[in-house]
Amino acid sequence: MGPPLKLFKNQKYQELKQECIKDSRLFCDPTFLPENDSLFYNRLLPGKVVWKRPQDICDDPHLIVGNISNHQLTQGRLGHKPMVSAFSCLAVQESHWTKTIPNHKEQEWDPQKTEKYAGIFHFRFWHFGEWTEVVIDDLLPTINGDLVFSFSTSMNEFWNALLEKAYAKLLGCYEALDGLTITDIIVDFTGTLAETVDMQKGRYTELVEEKYKLFGELYKTFTKGGLICCSIESPNQEEQEVETDWGLLKGHTYTMTDIRKIRLGERLVEVFSAEKVYMVRLRNPLGRQEWSGPWSEISEEWQQLTASDRKNLGLVMSDDGEFWMSLEDFCRNFHKLNVCRNVNNPIFGRKELESVLGCWTVDDDPLMNRSGGCYNNRDTFLQNPQYIFTVPEDGHKVIMSLQQKDLRTYRRMGRPDNYIIGFELFKVEMNRKFRLHHLYIQERAGTSTYIDTRTVFLSKYLKKGNYVLVPTMFQHGRTSEFLLRIFSEVPVQLRELTLDMPKMSCWNLARGYPKVVTQITVHSAEDLEKKYANETVNPYLVIKCGKEEVRSPVQKNTVHAIFDTQAIFYRRTTDIPIIVQVWNSRKFCDQFLGQVTLDADPSDCRDLKSLYLRKKGGPTAKVKQGHISFKVISSDDLTEL
């Protein structure tokens, strides 16, 4: 079974269709009438708009003619260019467009059974975390008999015009589509997770390793059903659609339709002086202005391949507007890359995406307030929702996406479309269970852009450990809803931090409720003991307080280890010390290298300290070789840390 389906306006497609067939009438949607209010909020019309059904526009109308990806699309007189690009991208992956256009064969016109046609269609969108079905009639706006929004160059094909109408209904009207980015639209069509890559900032033309790493990510994304598109920045409006020296258009979005690592045969190795080539195939959704550089149809490289070579290598093109180019030229010519990962179907049972709905709310009590504003508001910043997740191993790429609820439907009331939003990421203690209240020792691991777009994201390779993500609006004291999604190749156990301190319970009251909270960061362990000169030392930390302990990752082959390991403990009394032990990880039996014992009283200095290691037995035990550098902070206010 698929995810639960929400019915927009509570309209049930099959019931409405059967009623129309029974009454021998065509459906007219009472919730999205063929009127100017369905077109614009207050914009002047460029001419008289007449709403027509497809059979009144052309002979033999169809939802889809042949292959959905075979025909070019046009944005129309009043249409939206990002919408056409998103349609072209959607058509690349059948698994996506058949979900957005459900039961497309059943919805198709059948000239043999005209009595079964009721002028009603349904489409599905991923709307703020829920798959939502939208029902529409087939009345489309025209001026002088021509569709004013998007249409296909196959003049009797209507899937994109009808899909665009359903999307406009979902968002309020056609004008609500203004300002949407191509990634906004693709995400709404597919539920994918979008990441925008700055090709120039990535320096892929200079850094060979990064270039092939990018290829690997794109290949994996595409073969798993993801959608990818790219564009060339235009510095100003005058250069929009201006052709480059190699035939590409500035400010124009191209869709990736294939990606291949091709091993060349013996004859071709001699021709191209390479054993393999990395290639991408792109499509111009408007079907004009193709690439004219290397590997284009007019290039020397292309001419050196026979038709049989191209077929065997997979260098084929299915329609006009498609072209191949090398990875090097791809990285050199395009500035922005939109990568939309298919995260709806976990691979091999692994949960790659975790998501949570949340909201910014206002309360006079600082511990209850959840609208503290951005990082600039230091006194209130942590009065925002907080989410913790765990990266189980070093070096995993984590993509974090924060989407605010779309307010376009309220535009008629004068409300803004979007607030300025963003988020901060902090590396925190390995055993943190409660909310952050002050940032004393936490590492600021990342920050998103703060901007008034619907979605902001951050992509980072993170070290092993716990991270707290704080989603914020730029200004404090405002309310709204948001959707937080985190994608990683390993489960990260995303959960919200809701409590400020340990709960009062019969159990902890009987044992003694905590009176002191202590935060410790062990920066390093240095000059550690070696029994003989060529011994390998692989140190790690064990930080203990009572029955609770935190263990650091192992540092390989060093007597000068940098840890920056954090822990936090809620203690009944300072009589329960904090013990930091250093161990050497060995194959059969780990070796104890020494420890320090700390009272960690609230009155103690909070600066960085260094202490020699000692044998077991407390702060007066015999000194051993080596010392640790650490910072410890204690407070009798359980909500200070």
UniProtKB/Swiss-Prot annotation:
Tissue: Expressed only in placenta.
Region (Domain III) residue spans: 344-495
SUPFAM superfamilies registered for this protein in UniProt: C2 domain (Calcium/lipid-binding domain, CaLB), Calpain large subunit, middle domain (domain III), Cysteine proteinases
Annotated GO CC locations: cytoplasm; perinuclear region of cytoplasm; spindle microtubule
Gene Ontology BP, a term: regulation of cytoskeleton organization
Keyword Nucleus in annotation: no
InterPro entries: C2_Calpain, C2_dom, C2_domain_sf, C2_III, Calpain_cysteine_protease, Calpain_domain_III, Calpain_III, Calpain_III_sf
Keywords in alphabetical order: Cytoplasm, Cytoskeleton, Microtubule
Compartmental location: Cytoplasm, Perinuclear region; Cytoplasm, Cytoskeleton, Spindle
Primary residence: cytoplasm
Example GO molecular function: microtubule binding
Occurrences of domain Calpain catalytic (ranges): 26-343
Assembly behavior: Interacts (via domain III) with microtubules. Interacts (via domain II) with ARHGEF2 (via the N-terminal zinc finger).
Function of the protein: Microtubule-stabilizing protein that may be involved in the regulation of microtubule dynamics and cytoskeletal organization. May act as a regulator of RAC1 activity through interaction with ARHGEF2 to control lamellipodial formation and cell mobility. Does not seem to have protease activity as it has lost the active site residues.
Family indicated by similarity: Belongs to the peptidase C2 family.
Protein name listed in UniProt: Calpain-6
Organism annotation: Homo sapiens
